[in-house]
Amino acid sequence: MSTAEIVAESANLDAELRRLFGQDTRVEPLLGAAQMGRRIHGVDLTQDLSAAQASLLVALLDHYNIISFPAQGGDDFQLRHLERLANHFGAPIPHPKNYANYIDYKKKRVPLALKPVPEQTATRCNDAFPGAITCVDGADSPAVYIVTNLPGSGADLQEQVASGLHWHTDIEFEPVPLSTSMFFVQNVPTTRDALGGTWVPNTLPEAGYYHPYSPAELMQRRLSLPLNGETAYTDTAAAFADLPLERQAELEQVMLRRRLRKGDPGWLIPLVYTNPRTGRKSLHSPVWASRGKNIAPVEVEGMSEQASREFLDQIEAHVLQPKYRYDHVHQPGDITIWSNFSTLHNAPPAKSVINQPEDARLMYRISCKGEPSYSLPRQDSDAWVEANILPPYRSPADWVQS
């Protein structure tokens, strides 16, 4: 789409937002009028959505890649509200770290069990600074992954800082990859005691974290990360649209073999994703080793491992150019939703162990896959859930029914 077309479509969506949610709603760019990301004021996501409202929110995400709703964290907010919202965008997936015996379940199909309450992440968060920070109700849902530095922290402990991660999308290494992820933000760090006035110093990964032959320009872009607890994003739809048409056509023919382990046969999936609702194209997770050594590197069909790495490194360098980048500043009470098909993101350097509540980073993430559902409860078949949600999971009925 041209800049004029993007602006025109934005105006149409903004008008529809006011019609469906009220004239007090307003939209502001996170970057610029022709760039990804919008902050949407005046929408209360604790309320049930009509089918028309849910359809509009999905359309807003399709168009903007990232949408953020401030001031959602009132006294009545619970994480069931976030999980109900997630069900409109896709089927929420449970996080393996919430279970006590997930590995045994995968290998032996023993009955699943959540961790005992004292070992659950929410309990460990509450124990870090008793009385100062308490998790939001519903944090024990299997679908809620708590992104935080509170477990293992406390007033008597030595502060520690960790480096950033690889650029990635959330769980692209399954045959049906995740479509959407979202955060509810409870706490963000407010101290700025590092040299340069940031929350943390620019802490680099240890040697061997990236492939030793990664190009210097790519490494500079990979490591150019924010230092105040933001989440770094880049726009892979805009990056694809800026390529010459001939190059776009070439990349649309590329198939990637993704797999968990090197010995697995894996499966083929297109490098270029086409949004089924808009026709908009984007580069879906064009990263050779987005999980380092934890997940097998991607192979380009018909290329050797080295050629695959060099090919994808070139594309990663393209999408990480500063003109496609956006560092999202989190605020308590925000709900921020992003498309995993049209963005990459990164968790930048952060304090991993803290000794004061002012350094706390506490956010709740839910990710989902499959098609949107404008009415709830979702109508995913048992066979689809069994094949694509591991372990099989549906949100509690009383959370998603009006």
Regions found by a protein language model. Give the residues of each.
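Non-heme Fe(II) oxygenase catalytic core, chiefly the N-lobe of the double-stranded beta-helix
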Residues: 2-66, 71-332, 341-402
